[in-house]
Regions:
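Catalytic-core signal marking the mid-to-C-terminal active-site face
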Residues: 4-19, 27-28, 32-39, 361-473
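N-terminal glycine-rich anion-binding loops that anchor highly charged ligand groups
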Residues: 11-16, 28-41, 48-50, 88-93, ...
């Protein structure tokens, strides 16, 4: 049977839901967007305009949950690539927004560059285990300006061919984004059908739906673009100092935003995606390596399944800033448990030190950890062809199973997971794991087959970029 790990039983999941309803009904959420308050008020929420507090009747929450699709498929530009949500498989989403990069030559930390962004983007595009894009390196150009955003999206869709998850900061940026999506994917209806892009929307903890980003999101409503709702409550800082209460706060924030999404455009796909986190209590800093991240991630996955919603789970990372023993054990613990809860999307490969430092070698090592976790999830098969009683009877006491065809068949069918890094001959050659990973990265990038945009599409994007430049002067 497959392994499906849990940290909350059915009664505890129900308690999270019921306590969430009480908070939404009696305490509410501060909604900074006037447009969002009006949409929610029209849908039946109780709006206290002066304090910008919105309270959500239980009937509104339950109807919004009913309206949210329980399964849909994410697409991308690559022909034949798609990712069905809520269909029993898991893909990786590359972690994002690193400011620094571990230099492959010196091993030292330096500021990330556009070349780093390009290398990281091409690498994750080439790795089959990574199906969803975030910007791994926060690049220097002024991304806040429309021209910078259009140029950025042109580069994204040129170099990454699977599913893109991103956001905008302003209504104006959202308008440019919709133009880009129409050009790249062939119009509004094609975007609605293919779902090549999902919008990351992040309520602010505790219990705030902020203004600018929410208005930016509402600009794309009606295009069928999935909303990945990712509040980031931090235990002991922006949520109470208990794992279960942090789970409740995150759930409140997701459901409040889900109500807004469904009120604005019923049937819009939603991804349940809270990034529940904790701190280092001795310093107050966010700590990626704390084992509690794994527990919180599993709880979030379970709540999504409780509602029947697709889920994007965030793992913990590591407190370390270079590859090594600490990074290894923190990653293994914080990845194995959430993966065994089996979300649709798992966020996290490639970054160190609270998701601020990119390391290419660690990215590849994280993918290898995920491959091992995926094998663990499969568990022990017990189908009728798995027991091999007839083979045991045929070979009998003292028999040699190594040369029997059933052993070969089991190997070919995946009964063993064969790792691709850290093979014995590597150590005999005294390469070391990082050197091996570095060599493998070069091989992957050399073998990658680019899928450039059609010339006419690329030229139209250039034209949009020029128009955006005129707008900003």
């Amino acid at each position: 049977m497959q392994i499906q790990i849990q940290v909350l039983n059915q009664d505890e999941l129900t308690q999270v839901h019921e306590r969430t309803l009480r908070i939404l009904v009696h305490i509410g959420v501060r909604v900074e967007s006037a447009q969002a308050r009006k949409i929610l008020g029209d849908a039946g929420a109780h709006v206290e305009e002066k304090r910008r507090i919105v309270r959500f009747p239980q009937t509104l929450v339950e109807e919004s949950l009913r309206l949210a699709p329980k399964d849909f498929t994410l697409g991308g530009r690559r022909p034949g690539w798609y990712w069905p949500m809520n269909h029993g498989d898991c893909t990786l989403l590359a972690d994002g927004e690193a400011k620094w990069v571990v230099d492959a030559e010196t091993g030292k930390r330096r500021t990330g560059t556009e070349d780093d962004w390009l290398k990281a983007t091409q690498l994750i595009d080439a790795l089959d285990e990574i199906g969803v894009y975030w910007r791994m390196v926060s690049t220097p150009p002024p991304q806040g300006k429309p021209r910078g955003k259009v140029a950025y999206w042109r580069n994204v869709f040129t170099h990454f061919t699977k599913h893109v998850q991103d956001s905008t900061e302003t209504v104006e940026q959202s308008r440019w984004l919709l133009e880009v999506l129409q050009i790249v994917f062939g119009g509004r209806e094609a975007v609605k059908l293919l779902k090549p892009f999902s919008f990351l929307v992040c309520p602010v903890s505790p219990l705030v739906i902020e203004g600018s980003y929410t208005d930016a999101y509402l600009q794309i409503i009606g295009w069928g673009i999935p909303a990945a709702i990712m509040p980031m409550p931090i235990m002991g800082m922006t949520s109470p100092a208990r794992l279960i209460s942090t789970t409740v706060v995150g759930n409140c924030e997701v459901l409040a935003m889900l109500c807004l999404v469904q009120a604005a455009a019923p049937g819009t796909p939603v991804i349940y995606a809270p990034a529940l986190a904790t701190t280092e209590p001795r310093t107050g800093r966010y700590t990626g390596g704390a084992v509690e991240h794994a527990l919180l991630s599993i709880a979030a996955t379970q709540m999504a399944r409780f509602y029947g919603l697709p889920v994007e789970a965030s793992t913990g990372g590591t407190n370390e800033y270079i590859p090594g023993i600490q990074a290894g054990y923190e990653r293994a613990i914080n990845w194995t448990l959430p993966t065994l809860a089996w979300p649709d999307i798992l966020v996290g490969p490639g970054l160190f030190e609270g998701s601020t430092v990119l390391c290419y070698e660690q990215l590849l090592l994280d993918v290898e950890v995920f491959r091992h976790c995926r094998r663990l999830h499969l568990g022990i098969g017990t189908g009728k062809d798995q027991w091999l009683e007839e083979v045991i009877a045929r070979l009998g006491p003292g028999g040699n199973f190594l040369k029997h065809p059933s052993t070969r068949d089991a190997l070919r069918l995946g009964e063993w997971h064969l790792g691709t890094l850290g093979e014995p001959e590597v150590f005999q050659k005294k390469l070391g794991l990082l050197a091996e990973a570095r060599g493998r990265i070069n091989e992957i990038l050399a073998a990658r087959k680019p899928l450039p945009l059609d010339e006419d599409i690329d030229q139209e994007l250039v034209n949009i970029e020029r128009r955006a430049q005129v707008v900003v002067g």
